[in-house]
Amino acid sequence: MPWEEPAGEKPSCSHSQKAFHMEPAQKPCFTTDMVTWALLCISAETVRGEAPSQPRGIPHRSPVSVDDLWLEKTQRKKLQKQAHVERRLHIGAVHKDGVKCWRKTIITSPESLNLPRRSHPLSQSAPTGLNHMGWPEHTPGTAMPDGALDTAVCADEVGSEEDLYDDLHSSSHHYSHPGGGGEQLAINELISDGSVVCAEALWDHVTMDDQELGFKAGDVIEVMDATNREWWWGRVADGEGWFPASFVRLRVNQDEPADDDAPLAGNSGAEDGGAEAQSSKDQMRTNVINEILSTERDYIKHLRDICEGYVRQCRKRADMFSEEQLRTIFGNIEDIYRCQKAFVKALEQRFNRERPHLSELGACFLEHQADFQIYSEYCNNHPNACVELSRLTKLSKYVYFFEACRLLQKMIDISLDGFLLTPVQKICKYPLQLAELLKYTHPQHRDFKDVEAALHAMKNVAQLINERKRRLENIDKIAQWQSSIEDWEGEDLLVRSSELIYSGELTRVTQPQAKSQQRMFFLFDHQLIYCKKDLLRRDVLYYKGRLDMDGLEVVDLEDGKDRDLHVSIKNAFRLHRGATGDSHLLCTRKPEQKQRWLKAFAREREQVQLDQETGFSITELQRKQAMLNASKQQVTGKPKAVGRPCYLTRQKHPALPSNRPQQQVLVLAEPRRKPSTFWHSISRLAPFRK
């Protein structure tokens, strides 16, 4: 937006000098400006009088006169006032094709209203090109409820669609939560009008707080209040409470026709009603397809920002980041970016622009099904990335560097760990999108079978990734448990095992004296560990041995006299190895306990076979890191109860006191997955009891 000369006579030089001296080079008051200011100040102190060489390609700025500064300040105040008025005028409901749209003014960044930048030496922790950074001017556009602009309305004002897309996402996209920008206004308007707004849970929200709403991944939540950006008030069944807005995905079609509203057959009006209902269903399918394409474009832009804004800048600073650190922080996100670009290109080719509801997108998901499995590696590495980022951000130079990278790429105000969480969120969102697409796809549609198969395939991919993620989270718990066992012998448990299947107290009958011993048994994949309880301190366990489950046969024994040991047995079973003839007789106190153990042995064999088929394994680095973490956390006396894994999202509740403990919530889950028995089993271990 070009500057305009103010009407009237320009003030005298003395007046302009007075205005200039009243505000001498003030620090910017916004967070992004503060970081840039800090970077420039640090670099100025670092060089200590050395004249920096002018970077190639950067034009020298001409001196700024006092009169120019006064004019610029006057125009800045005028623009700020005008922007404030325009925002009030343009925020309002606009109806188009029966869909509520919202006029949303994208306010010019305050940084573009500051004084012109002078030539400053760059900080040693600043990414290259920081002095090229500037904020483009934006014009108001029409924002749809999903945050996408209506390009038809403002194409003439803004320019090309590509420029419009880049400008939009440099200022107002909403990766962190679904209620960004105009979407939040639309939600509250619908709620105030009495409409029912529904959202689908992306992940489990597990909470012990009676003011928060717990739900499972895939549950449908009625949003009752969305005035807060981070926490919404909702209802599931008979329960109401607060829940994180980032944990849900708003349904594309909120006003769905009820089944009982279908027209009655037998007259011409019914035929017209049937055609109208089909047209409505086609429109809803169009909405879902548009959402899939829109979110994919957003996601590609997001991945490009990470790869170009962070990864590329970090590689230029070999003095700050090693290759191993970069692999830990960013994982294989560049591979994901390449695969997603090919996937989006395939979606665009199959998109019917004239009649979007006839688009056939299911085949695209099937063709790229194998490519989506690379998300497994990324999701498995993400906890390590969080740990490494937490360690680096304790140093101020890394905080400044990451913030400067974000500013240079013109990304929204979210920390790097928040950006890196998006691929994990994305892979969990595909099954929900495909399920909604299948819902509005007629069985006679050419895309019906492909969408149905794609939904099944993406559920399997998400389930596989979720299972691997859960297993990797368990290894820290297993390492901590092993470190609490006294007199441990032999190799570490994690060398062969990664999950606790079952645990409990059994009576072990030894040969040849047929002596009975009470022992605590812990069944892991590939091995069975047994320990002895301390006579005085029952929470202390002593290692006594282990059995290799590979090659062992579990034999169910009837009550009566054992032929080998010649003793009476009850609720017993035998672990027998045919190759060596080794035999171990174990007894439970109750028949139901025996049945649970027999089922646990069957699950252990199934788990081992599944790991072999899927190629799941724990790397040497992961084992060493888990054992190192366990050694650091080991304390004398009774170990404290272990909380949930580090791969968690912590949210601040707006309606609760700030000193209240924040509830940890697992952020990776598959809708309606089979409940894990790990937490139930691990709670039975003595070190994890309170």
Curated annotation (Swiss-Prot):
Transmembrane stretches, start-end: none
Source superkingdom: Eukaryota
Region (Disordered): 113-145, 257-282
UniProt-annotated stretches for the region ABR (APC-binding region) domain: 73-126
Keyword field contains Disulfide bond: no
Keywords: Cell membrane, Cell projection, Cytoplasm, Guanine-nucleotide releasing factor, Membrane, SH3 domain
An example Gene Ontology molecular-function term: protein domain specific binding
Matches recorded under Gene3D superfamilies: Dbl homology (DH) domain (1.20.900.10), Pleckstrin-homology domain (PH domain)/Phosphotyrosine-binding domain (PTB) (2.30.29.30), SH3 Domains (2.30.30.40)
Keyword Membrane attached: yes
Domain DH: 284-468
Residue ranges the record marks as coiled coil: none
Gene Ontology process terms (BP): filopodium assembly; intracellular signal transduction; lamellipodium assembly; regulation of small GTPase mediated signal transduction
Residues in SH3 domain copies: 194-253
Domain PH as annotated: residue spans: 499-606
InterPro entries registered for this protein in UniProt: DBL_dom_sf, DH_dom, GDS_CDC24_CS, PH-like_dom_sf, PH_domain, SH3-like_dom_sf, SH3_domain, SOS1_NGEF_PH
Tissues in which the UniProt entry reports expression: Expressed at high levels in the brain, skeletal muscle and testis and at low levels in the kidney, lung, small intestine, ovary and prostate. Expression is aberrantly enhanced in most colorectal tumors.
A cellular component term, taken from the record's GO annotations: ruffle membrane
Domain comment, as recorded: In an autoinhibited form the SH3 domain binds intramolecularly to the DH domain, thus blocking the Rac-binding site.
Subunit composition and interactions: Isoform 3 interacts with RHOA and RAC1, and (via ABR domain) with APC. Found in a complex consisting of ARHGEF4, APC and CTNNB1.
Function: Acts as a guanine nucleotide exchange factor (GEF) for RHOA, RAC1 and CDC42 GTPases. Binding of APC may activate RAC1 GEF activity. The APC-ARHGEF4 complex seems to be involved in cell migration as well as in E-cadherin-mediated cell-cell adhesion. Required for MMP9 up-regulation via the JNK signaling pathway in colorectal tumor cells. Involved in tumor angiogenesis and may play a role in intestinal adenoma formation and tumor progression.
PANTHER family (UniProt xref): RHO GUANINE NUCLEOTIDE EXCHANGE FACTOR 4
Protein name, entry field: Rho guanine nucleotide exchange factor 4
Native source species: Homo sapiens
